[in-house]
C-alpha cells in the first residue's frame, strides 16, 4: 500500500498503472507516491494509510486483490470495511464511515509523526 515497486524500494508508481481509476484515485496515488518518496529520502518509513479511509481502502484493494481476478477500481464505498454495527440509513451509515475514517487517519498520522509542510 506504499506504491513502491517490490524489487526496488526507491521506485514509486502512481496513476493508472497501479490499477486505480478516476480522478480521485489518480490524485491520491500521486500524492501518496510523492509523500512516500520524500519520506524515503528523509530516512522515514513510508505511509501505509488505514484501510478505513478511502485512500487506504483503495490502496489495500490494489495491493491485495487476486492477480487473476484483478479489475481496476475507483474509489467507492464498497471498498471500506463494514462498520461494527449495521446502520440502515444510508446518510447515517456514510456519516459513520466518514467519522471513522477521520478518526483513524488522524490517529495514524499522529502515530507516525506526519506533519504536512506549511505553505510559505
Give short role names for the model-derived ranges.
Residues 1-21, 63-78:
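FAD-binding beta-loop-beta segment adjacent to the flavin cofactor pocket
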Residues 9-14, 38-41, 80-86:
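Short acidic (Asp/Glu) and glycine-rich catalytic loops that position anionic groups and cofactors
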Residues 20-28:
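Short, conserved micro-motifs enriched in small and acidic residues
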Residues 27-49:
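Internal hydrophobic alpha-helix adjacent to the cofactor/substrate pocket in enzyme cavities
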Residues 31-38, 59, 102-106:
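Predominant activation on well-ordered alpha-helical scaffold segments within soluble catalytic domains
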Residues 39-43, 63-67, 107-114:
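Generic secondary-structure signature for well-ordered alpha-helical cores
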Residues 47-70:
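Intrinsically disordered, low-complexity charged/polar segments
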Residues 72-120:
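C-terminal auxiliary extensions adjacent to catalytic cores
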Amino acid at each position: 500500500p506504499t506504491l513502491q515497486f517490490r524489487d526496488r524500494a526507491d521506485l514509486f508508481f502512481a496513476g493508472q498503472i497501479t490499477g486505480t481509476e478516476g480522478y480521485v484515485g489518480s490524485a491520491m496515488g500521486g500524492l501518496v507516491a510523492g509523500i512516500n518518496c520524500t519520506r524515503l529520502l528523509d530516512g522515514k518509513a513510508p505511509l501505509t494509510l488505514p484501510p478505513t479511509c478511502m485512500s487506504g481502502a483503495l490502496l489495500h484493494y490494489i495491493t491485495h486483490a487476486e492477480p487473476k481476478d484483478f479489475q481496476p477500481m475507483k474509489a467507492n464505498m464498497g471498498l471500506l470495511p463494514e462498520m461494527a454495527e449495521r446502520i440502515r440509513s444510508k446518510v447515517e451509515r456514510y456519516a459513520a464511515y466518514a467519522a471513522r475514517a477521520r478518526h483513524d487517519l488522524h490517529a495514524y498520522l499522529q502515530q507516525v509523526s506526519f506533519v504536512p509542510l506549511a505553505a510559505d
